């Protein structure tokens, strides 16, 4: 059993080592093919990508802000409707104050 296990583990090690060395060789070839000009061009492209990322982030931020404002407005409208139709409605601020007062008095 140990002999079979050793043969399997040796085969796995040699396969993983050959795959690793092939990957390293590929990376070296890609780096050698680029040369100095290719490397500087990649760097310039990255800086442009960063600017695009910043713009995307700003647009996302603006959209998110608008969505939050819209959601707040929707909740406000919903609250107004709820107050109108439900005589037992208590706003959350009032509930918070009541809980705070009870906590200070030691009832909770």
Swiss-Prot record:
Coiled coil: none annotated. One of its GO terms (cellular component) is chromatin. Residues 1-27 are annotated as: Disordered. This is Putative uncharacterized protein YLR053C. GO terms for molecular function: promoter-specific chromatin binding; protein-containing complex binding; transcription coactivator activity. Residues 1-10 have a biased composition (Basic and acidic residues). Residues 12-22 have a biased composition (Polar residues). GO terms for biological process: cellular response to nitrogen starvation; positive regulation of transcription by RNA polymerase II.
